[in-house]
A protein has these predicted regions:
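Conserved SAM/SAH cofactor-binding pocket of Class I
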Residues: 12-21, 32, 36-117, 121-124, ...
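Mobile active-site "lid"/loop adjacent to the S-adenosyl-L-methionine
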Residues: 126-159
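Low-complexity, intrinsically disordered or signal/transmembrane-proximal segments
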Residues: 28-29
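Conserved Class I SAM-dependent methyltransferase catalytic core
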Residues: 3, 9, 149-208, 213
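SAM/dcSAM-binding transferase cores
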Residues: 207-262
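SAM-dependent Rossmann-like transferase core, predominantly class I methyltransferases
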Residues: 1-21, 25, 47-48, 54-65, ...
């Protein structure tokens, strides 16, 4: 599995879950005797992360790196991947990372995945092409095309809304920008509120080609319903800055990804 730009953008740009209902960064209250250290789930649990369709594990690894940089030490990242070679690669990558004790990879289909855990953060770069564009490589077909055993974003929305995303948790995914209208309509039908939309364009003169969308569950009182999401733009390249360099990354893209690229 190659490391694509979509995965890098999602892993770097997605909003990390709040520490409100989890162990605070580096357990900052651990030595504060005035802080009531309850053993209740709402105070003591760590952050639960799900990378749905994790491929080689790059997004989960980036999330772990960012959590560590933010001071979190209590978290678990579960990668679910239907493709056996990719799952094996993810296992190797997880095991070789400095945070190997926080990872596990399950070689199963998301369609049959029924965890008892609810997640604070669900992240995914899901399949999005329809079957009319199937490539000859069956593994690539499963990773990038809906239909069959593929777990596309409609299924991901349903999964998150079916008790697998905690109240206050975040579902983050990246899709072709053309899916925006359908995505928002489907999400609303499952009671998911669009909290943030990052429109990604390759150059300043082009329309956005990718969308990072983040969702939360609507509250029981309906307070989240109807709130306008935060909208942002990211431009990847600007050839006008350095005409002789075909990879003229913008400052904003370099700032976003500098901690991940070698």
């Amino acid at each position: 599995m190659k490391v694509g730009t979509d995965a890098v953008i999602l892993g770097a740009a997605a909003t990390l879950p709040s520490c409100e209902n989890s162990l605070s960064p580096a357990s900052q209250y651990a030595e504060d005797e005035s802080f009531p250290l309850s053993t209740s789930d709402s105070v003591r649990r760590g952050i639960e992360v799900l990378d749905a369709g994790c491929g080689s594990g790059v997004i989960g690894l980036m999330v772990a790196q960012r959590l560590e940089a933010a001071g979190f030490r209590e978290y678990d990242v579960t990668g679910v991947e239907i493709d056996s070679p990719a799952a094996e690669q993810a296992e190797r990558n997880f095991g070789a990372s400095p945070w190997s004790g926080h990872f596990k990879c399950l070689n199963v289909s998301m369609l049959g995945f029924a965890p008892e855990t609810a997640y604070d953060f669900i992240v995914s770069n899901p399949p999005y092409y329809d079957d009319s564009l199937l490539p000859p490589d069956s593994r690539r077909s499963t990773a990038r095309h809906t239909g069959g055993d593929a777990f596309g974003y409609p299924q991901l929305l349903e999964f998150a809304a079916s008790g697998h995303l905690r109240a206050g948790g975040i579902l983050a995914l990246i899709l072709p920008h053309q899916e925006l209208t359908r995505l928002l309509r489907l999400a609303a039908s499952y009671g998911l509120h669009a909290a943030r939309l990052l429109h990604v364009r390759t150059t300043p003169s082009k329309e956005p080609s990718r969308l990072v969308a983040e969702f939360t569950l609507d509250t029981a009182s309906g307070k989240a319903a109807g709130i306008t999401p935060t909208e942002e733009y990211l431009t990847i390249q600007d050839a006008s800055r350095f005409p002789q360099n075909k990879n003229s990354w913008t400052d904003e893209y370099l700032t976003l990804t500098r901690e991940f690229y070698l």
